């Protein structure tokens, strides 16, 4: 059963990809969706069998690499962390497959699309079930490759080409850091197996290595390289630029990437390596810093976006910041709890956005929408549920995890850390709630409630989506309402031993009990900020809309708006400092020198010219006259004689010098 969870999506991908021409769109859709649905059912069974009984299952398939101490096998680890991720991945993937049947029905390459979706799911399953770093890295790279194929699915579009290449290259930076971490882990622990690494970590707590004169803590350096990998995959500040541009792919791709796969890989990596991170306070501080900055930066940027999918994309970036933030506070279980909850309402938001885009003839600019409530009441209802869950409205899924993270941040700033920069990071995360609420309800107003800016011909074509697109939305909306309440006590309840040995937290880093001692105002603060964001968004959209465009307020904010719409100049910075110098170097060196004959001149062409040149000179010595040959012989003999005599004289002089030196000193 456990292996079927993994290999059913692979089977569906191979059949859809190679047999789609014979099966047709309907046959491909049915078979591929059935494979993922069955895999999700088996994942639920595995969750009940392993998660609820707090057991671990390890499956060994075959030895893979044997080279001295380097030993890698094909094996799979199923523990509470793994089965939770399996349920999230396969459930969301199943609903995305069902949704895609209708969404992509007019695309002639639908079998290829289904094949890409399933191979994406398969590589993510390999990533979370691996019991060693090499196998995990295979899944890690496979997810990156599949994301490139899906973002570039409409490969005739230039924007899709650019976005896919950008995602691939930016993630290569993080992958390079992860590969360095794997090399260093093998050098230190002499193994890449999880069980060996985690059992030996305490023994290396006081180990240091010297590099370029700097004394570095081994565990901190390893954790830093692993976190660089997480920065790339989970789109943290600095390597986040690929995530908004990934919206060029079909909307189901965006839902799968942002809800259950790809971006969650970095968070999963941090949670899986909690036994290592716990022994590195420096890395925990870095996680808190990056998480809070990412959450705040993405929330502020989302306020000024006009593309429907980009607004939701920046909300993903912000929520990933909360997850990394939580890992930095050693609350790995809360981070995974939020990851699971986030999968429901984020998939719901993206698929609802796809339903809207599908209805308005592929228009994505929210300013051109409006008045869609009376045409699409069901889509409006489920999107409102997803929005409320995103902002952490009480008793919805996001409330139980997001507010818990914010409470724990306040514990960190109030009690055990007592550092000004940690407090600042905590308040950044808290203030992000206001901006999240603002842009979320701005999206609702611009898309559904404001007066429409659509052409009458387009407005007449607006309609509610079909049952195959509505069914996943209903399932996800139910999950967005009840999932957080149902699994809260199991995942993060006081005294719950659900995670067992899958997550390790040092006793001094545990802060759950202190959450009960927070002032009531601090506990209510996220909800108050959410209400303020809703009120401010409503006030601006209803009352200040005309005033804003007729007053000088726009001029006052124009620079700030321009700065954010330029993505804070991250792309410009990378282009000026990295991309353009490399291109100029390539043009001046590679193109103008190497590609114009230097390699040929110093290679086979140059060697043949060299031989030909000297052969022509030597040919001229063959005159056929014996006097010339005698001259060359005498000249050669005299030359060698002079060299030998000079060498003998030099040797004799050195021996005499050595003799007199020893004589006088002795």
UniProtKB/Swiss-Prot annotation:
Top-level class of the enzyme under EC nomenclature: translocase
Chief place of localization: mitochondrion
EC number: 7.1.1.2
Source superkingdom: Eukaryota
Gene Ontology process terms (BP): ATP synthesis coupled electron transport; electron transport coupled proton transport
Localization, UniProt: Mitochondrion inner membrane
Catalytic activity: a ubiquinone + NADH + 5 H(+)(in) = a ubiquinol + NAD(+) + 4 H(+)(out)
Chain ranges passing through the membrane: 3-23, 31-51, 59-78, 82-101, 119-139, 168-190, 211-231, 251-271, 283-303, 311-333, 337-357, 375-395, 421-441, 467-487, 524-544, 572-594, 629-649
One term of GO molecular function: NADH dehydrogenase (ubiquinone) activity
The keyword Phosphoprotein is assigned to this record: no
Membrane topology (UniProt): Multi-pass membrane protein
GO cellular component term, pick one: mitochondrial inner membrane
Claim: rRNA-binding is one of the keywords in the record: no
Key words of the record: Electron transport, Membrane, Mitochondrion, Mitochondrion inner membrane, NAD, Respiratory chain, Translocase, Transmembrane, Transmembrane helix, Transport, Ubiquinone
NCBIfam families according to UniProt: NDH_I_L, PRK06590.1
Family recorded in the similarity comment: Belongs to the complex I subunit 5 family.
Job description of the protein: Core subunit of the mitochondrial membrane respiratory chain NADH dehydrogenase (Complex I) that is believed to belong to the minimal assembly required for catalysis. Complex I functions in the transfer of electrons from NADH to the respiratory chain. The immediate electron acceptor for the enzyme is believed to be ubiquinone.
Protein name: NADH-ubiquinone oxidoreductase chain 5
Lineage: Eukaryota, Rhodophyta, Florideophyceae, Rhodymeniophycidae, Gigartinales
Originating gene: ND5
């Amino acid at each position: 059963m456990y292996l079927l969870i993994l290999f059913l999506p692979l089977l569906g991908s191979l059949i859809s990809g190679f047999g789609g021409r014979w099966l047709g769109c309907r046959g491909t859709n049915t078979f591929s969706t059935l494979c993922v649905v069955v895999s999700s059912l088996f994942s639920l069974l595995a969750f009940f069998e392993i998660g609820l009984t707090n057991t671990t299952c390890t499956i060994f398939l075959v030895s893979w690499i044997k080279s001295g101490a380097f030993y890698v096998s094909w094996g799979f680890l199923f523990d509470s962390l793994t089965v939770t991720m399996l349920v999230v991945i396969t459930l969301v993937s199943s609903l995305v497959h069902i949704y895609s049947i209708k969404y992509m029905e007019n695309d002639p390459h639908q079998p290829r699309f289904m094949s890409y979706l399933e191979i994406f799911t398969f590589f993510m399953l390999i990533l979370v079930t691996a019991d060693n770093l090499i196998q995990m890295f295979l899944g890690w790279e496979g997810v990156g490759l599949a994301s490139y194929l899906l973002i570039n699915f409409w490969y005739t579009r230039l924007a899709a080409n650019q976005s896919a290449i950008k995602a691939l290259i930016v993630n290569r930076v993080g992958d390079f850091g992860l590969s360095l971490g794997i090399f260093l882990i093998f050098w230190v622990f002499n193994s890449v197996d999880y069980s060996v690494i985690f059992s030996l970590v305490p023994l290396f707590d006081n180990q240091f290595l010297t590099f370029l004169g700097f004394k570095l803590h081994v565990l901190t350096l390893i954790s830093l390289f692993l976190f660089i990998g997480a920065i790339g995959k989970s789109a943290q500040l600095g390597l986040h630029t690929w995530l908004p541009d990934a919206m060029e792919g079909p909307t189901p791709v965006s839902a799968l990437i942002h809800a259950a796969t790809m971006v969650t890989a970095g968070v999963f990596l941090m949670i899986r390596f909690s036994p290592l991170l716990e022994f590195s306070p420096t890395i925990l501080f870095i996680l808190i810093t990056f998480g809070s900055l990412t959450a705040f930066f993405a929330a502020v940027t989302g306020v000024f976006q006009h593309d429907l999918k980009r607004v939701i994309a920046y909300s993903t970036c912000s929520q990933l910041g909360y997850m990394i933030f939580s890992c930095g506070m050693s609350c790995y279980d809360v981070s995974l709890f939020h990851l699971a909850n986030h999968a429901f309402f984020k998939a719901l938001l993206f698929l609802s956005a796809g339903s809207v885009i599908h209805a308005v003839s592929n228009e994505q600019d929210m300013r051109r929408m409006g008045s869609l409530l009376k045409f699409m009441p069901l889509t409006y209802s489920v999107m409102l549920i997803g929005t409320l869950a995103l902002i952490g409205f009480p008793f919805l899924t996001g409330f139980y995890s997001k507010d818990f993270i914010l409470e724990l941040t306040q514990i960190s700033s109030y009690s055990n850390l007592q550092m000004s920069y940690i407090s600042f990071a905590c308040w950044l995360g808290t203030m992000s709630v206001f901006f999240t609420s603002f842009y979320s309800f701005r999206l609702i107003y611009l898309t559904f409630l404001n007066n429409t800016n659509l052409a009458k011909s387009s407005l007449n074509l607006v309609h509610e989506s079909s049952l195959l697109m509505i069914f996943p939305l209903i399932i996800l909306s139910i999950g967005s309402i009840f999932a957080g309440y149902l699994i809260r006590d199991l995942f993060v309840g006081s005294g719950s031993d659900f995670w067992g040995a899958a997550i390790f937290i040092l006793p001094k880093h545990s802060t759950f009990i202190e959450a009960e001692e927070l002032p009531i105002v601090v506990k209510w603060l996220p909800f108050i900020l959410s209400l303020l964001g809703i009120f401010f968004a409503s006030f601006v959209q209803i009352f200040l809309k005309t005033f804003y465009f007729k007053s000088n307020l726009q001029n006052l904010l124009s620079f700030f708006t321009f700065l954010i719409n330029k993505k804070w100049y991250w792309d410009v910075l990378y282009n000026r400092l990295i991309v353009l110098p490399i291109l100029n170097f390539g043009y001046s060196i590679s193109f103008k020198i190497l590609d114009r004959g230097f390699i040929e001149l110093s290679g086979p062409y140059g060697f043949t010219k060299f031989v030909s040149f000297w052969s022509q000179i030597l040919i001229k010595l063959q005159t056929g006259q014996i006097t010339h040959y005698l001259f060359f012989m005498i000249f050669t003999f005299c030359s060698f004689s002079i060299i030998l005599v000079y060498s003998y004289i030099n040797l004799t002089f050195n021996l005499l010098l050595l003799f007199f030196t020893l004589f006088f000193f002795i």
